[in-house]
Design a protein with these regions (language model features):
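Amphipathic alpha-helical interaction surfaces in cytosolic regulatory modules
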Residues: 31-104
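Short beta-strand/loop segment at the start of cytosolic alpha/beta domains
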Residues: 1-24
């Protein structure tokens, strides 16, 4: 299953392979785009136990975006699954470090 969708200033690409979900984010994960990302996640969360998020093209993240990542992490933790962030650039990493999310989320 491949779903592509424009989300305000952010493009998301969801690919689900059985219980594994791959999400590619491009643009800004902000107050406008986070709710739509969350809505899509809520639709499919029951069918996944592992999430890989590819962030190479993510240019900006706000607290709304961080909340979505935390919710995804908590959901996967309940299922004894995993959430892994890939390709985090230096600007996004700085936000994750300042907020302490680098100690909560698995980043490779």
């Amino acid at each position: 299953m491949v779903i592509e969708k424009e989300v305000r200033k952010m493009k998301t690409d969801f690919k689900q392979h059985e219980a594994k979900l791959e999400i590619t984010l491009e643009g800004e994960l902000n107050t406008h785009s986070a709710p739509e990302l969350d809505a899509k996640f809520q639709e499919i969360k029951d069918s996944v136990s592992s999430i890989d998020i590819y962030m190479e093209r993510l240019t900006y993240i706000t607290s709304a975006g961080l909340r979505i990542l935390l919710a995804m992490e908590q959901e996967m933790e309940q299922k004894e699954g995993a959430l892994v962030l890939h390709g985090v650039n230096s600007e996004i990493m700085e936000v994750l470090e300042i907020t302490g999310f680098d100690t909560i989320l698995e980043i490779v």
